[in-house]
Amino acid sequence: MTAKSKFRGSFTALVTPFKNGGLDEAAFRGLVSWQIAEGTHGLVPVGTTGESPTVTHDEHKQLVEWCVDEAKARVPVIAGAGSNSTAEAIGLAKHAEKVGAAAVLVVTPYYNKPTQEGLYQHFKAVNDAIGIPIIIYNIPGRSVVDMSTDTMKRLFELKNISGVKDATANIARVSAQRAAMGEDFNQLSGEDITALGYMAHGGHGCISVTSNVAPRLCSEFQTACLKGDYATALKIQDKLVPLHTNLFIEANPAPVKYALSLLGKMSNTLRLPMVELSEANREIVRQSMVHAGLLN
């Protein structure tokens, strides 16, 4: 992958399966292979949905290695490599590059609330340390800071900054970022429910939670959007809206892990402080899967 590579389509923000207190390698590899077979365009391990805050650094690196190995270059792997410590982010990014990831996803530093200049210097330091594309992960709802379009424009002048995973849920940002950086700046939605509007405004794809359980539908949806076939995309969206909504009925990834357990893909196990989906909401998620045609 060149630094300004194009990333297009449906990218799955992979969950992390656990078993007996550790990682479930077989379930994780099985999920990766199934995703590719179902048409997913790319894979994103150890992000928010992958419970990155509660895996150890060694586990984080192991998950990236397994994902790259199982993908076998059939689709790009955009490895989660974020931290609120610049040194840690650089270490994770270097490891991802070393083991063959196509790119890294680097979240805006959380909790310590850097200024826009601090954000610039953080991403510049990661940029200067590696030679593969970097996708900025802008998620102010979790990190508390919102990277401005002006800061993104400055960063896009660097050789490895390739685009953004936009989890602001502000569709107007797509047009503003497109005007500032042009069509070569990869714009990937981080919000399943608004992805249709995001694509219509000029987006290039989605890093999706829903595609964990509905990879084929999400792939077909993105393919239709990229072709400009919004009539087909809308029909698929109608199937997916209950899932898009109810996979966030409680904190992610509890609902999506429960959904995957219904498909027999893995156990419904999370690490504290995340807990399993409550009994009260399980039938709601199941009915959303029925609506999408994933269960009878």
Curated annotation (Swiss-Prot):
The active site is at Y137, K165. Coiled coil: none annotated. Its EC number is 4.3.3.7. Disulfide bonds: none annotated. Gene3D superfamilies: Aldolase class I (3.20.20.70). Pfam families: DHDPS. Homotetramer; dimer of dimers. This is 4-hydroxy-tetrahydrodipicolinate synthase. It comes from Afipia carboxidovorans (strain ATCC 49405 / DSM 1227 / KCTC 32145 / OM5) (Oligotropha carboxidovorans). The lineage of its organism: Bacteria, Pseudomonadati, Pseudomonadota, Alphaproteobacteria, Hyphomicrobiales.
